[in-house]
Amino acid sequence: MKVVISRFNPETDSEPHFETYEVSVSEGARVLNVLDAVHDTIDASLGYRHCCRGGQCGSCAVRVNGEPALACMQEAKDGDIIEPLSLPRIRDLIVDIAPAIAQMAWLNTGSCFECSHVTADDIEEIKPLRECIECFSCISSCPAVGASTYAGPTAIRQQQRLNLDPRDKADRVEEAVAKGLFSCTTCHKCVEVCPKSIETPRKAVEKLRALAVKRGLSLPAHKSLASLIESTGRSVERKEPTFLERVSDVIEPEGEVRATVGFFVGCMFNGRVVQPALDAMEVLKRNGIRVIIPKSQVCCGSPLIRTGFTGFIPELQERNVKAFVDAGVDTVLTMCAGCGSTLKNDYNTPFRVADITEFLAEIGFEEPAKVEGTYTYHDPCHLLRGQHISEQPRVLLKSVAEKFVDMSPRCCGAGGGVKSGQPEEAALIGAVRAEMVKETGADYIVTVCPFCEFHLHQVTGLTVKNIASLMLEGYRKKDC
């Protein structure tokens, strides 16, 4: 088996470099077995950490083909590229975890006479946050770390763990705010790379933000947003006649009816960028789909949940569920990644919720004509990790793009209330994404999120198209 390992000795090297090694290992060998073989048979100077060899200590975390993994658990493949985590480097695959550890709080019981009794219910609530093995893969992958003062997912997870512990006497909410609580974009990359799949955004970040809101510690922009939603039922002020004002309650398809669905438009596509939603209706009509649009639908509540203003959520949920139940639909389509993720994960709906790309890829769609240009696709975090949808939009895009150049996923910085609350941080995160876009050589970016569309246009200067709008271009070209 051949592997490529990133090497760096600060005493002799001016910069890191890659070296290729060929070793003999058993079938099913782990990356750690390969590193051992290189160390024991080829180069004893190779530096790497390990201890338990059972996925419990976290010390052997490295990057394999660009993604964090525990070397003792990741099966080795021929051609693997092994690098250190994206943390300050000491030597070879060894990184400095001291700064990350320094950000973590520890139990503060005060006087032993003040200690509270821990109940079984307390333990159950804390348990998911105790699974952390401190591998720091999450910090290595977090887009907000380095772009702000954010202490990172591990530190915030620990803040909530201690906040839930009745024995702890410190003010963990105020500490969390000081450690950059509102800098998290809730992209869920930390969950994706966590060996224990700890839901830090939902079980720590959003919980602490809700407590911060009750304490008056939220960001001014988030307060204004919450007030707007409570007073109007919408998270954005209208710039033109809204989508719901322009369309009829039922949009009949061209030809045979293949399916009947409800459509949840979301605030951005309703009042700020209406045309992509209108384009989506034309695409659905073209593909034999009857669309029912309840006019009583309101904001899904995603901006409130992500920023901690959860008090108004039950009313929004009730109004939206009732709107579609009364419409008598079994499936509700969304075209905003954030709305779709919220309806799927934060609601308990009696109907199915599906993204428009998910639905079209599932039932089949008419092939459009190819549209000129080179296109790349940006995965919205709330679609990729919030709904586990990745291939479906690419299927649609490849059907219409003259040339498609793929791009690895990375948060653009617009989510989690960061774009509205801390725009400077959002711009820094976006600048990294902009460089990735530049490397593709694409003329256009395509995505399925209005917030990503706005932000990517700002940081790249490129035209950003919604997949529905691009497909409609292809259909119109086909009809010429």
Describe each region flagged by the PLM:
Residues 24, 63-66:
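Short strand-turn-strand beta-turns centered on an Asx-Gly dipeptide
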Residues 29-41, 86, 90-233, 315, ...:
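Ferredoxin-type iron-sulfur electron-transfer modules in oxidoreductases and energy-metabolism complexes
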Residues 80-84:
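Extracellular beta-sheet/turn segments enriched in Thr/Pro/Gly and aliphatic residues
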Residues 28-34, 75, 242:
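Short, structural beta-strand-to-alpha-helix junction motif
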Residues 1-25, 200-480:
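Iron-sulfur cluster-binding electron-transfer modules in prokaryotic oxidoreductases
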Residues 43-49:
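Active-site phosphate-binding and catalytic loops of NTP-dependent enzymes
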Residues 52, 57-60, 72, 132-138, ...:
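Short cysteine clusters
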